[in-house]
Amino acid sequence: MLQKKIEEEAAKYKYAMLKKCCYDGAYRNDDETCEERAARIKIGPKCVKAFKDCCYIANQVRAEQSHKNIQLGR
């Protein structure tokens, strides 16, 4: 589900460089926030926006998936 959401978001960007920024933002990094990671981007504001958008979407999907009810067969 996460991959599908990120693919949909990346498809909104016309240029390959911006798509890469989006995919980079989707990578999991529990040590830093999206803002902290985006602060290191030097390419330009469009890349930063794509990075943050995908980072926030990925974090949201991960949070939703981690709270699913799991039934154990006992």
Curated annotation (Swiss-Prot):
Keywords: Complement alternate pathway, Complement pathway, Disulfide bond, Immunity, Inflammatory response, Innate immunity, Secreted. Residues 21-55 form the Anaphylatoxin-like domain. SUPFAM superfamilies: Anaphylotoxins (complement system). Residues 72-74 are annotated as: Required for 90% of C5a activity. It holds the Pfam family ANATO. Disulfide bonds join C21-C47, C22-C54, C34-C55. GO terms for biological process: complement activation, alternative pathway; complement activation, classical pathway; inflammatory response. It is found in: Secreted. Residues 15-44 are annotated as: Involved in C5AR1 binding. Signal peptide: none annotated. One of its GO terms (cellular component) is extracellular region. Mediator of local inflammatory process released following cleavage by C5 convertase. Acts by binding to its receptor (C5AR1 or C5AR2), activating G protein-coupled receptor signaling and inducing a variety of responses including intracellular calcium release, contraction of smooth muscle, increased vascular permeability, and histamine release from mast cells and basophilic leukocytes. C5a is also a potent chemokine which stimulates the locomotion of polymorphonuclear leukocytes and directs their migration toward sites of inflammation. This is Complement C5a anaphylatoxin. The lineage of its organism: Eukaryota, Metazoa, Chordata, Craniata, Vertebrata.
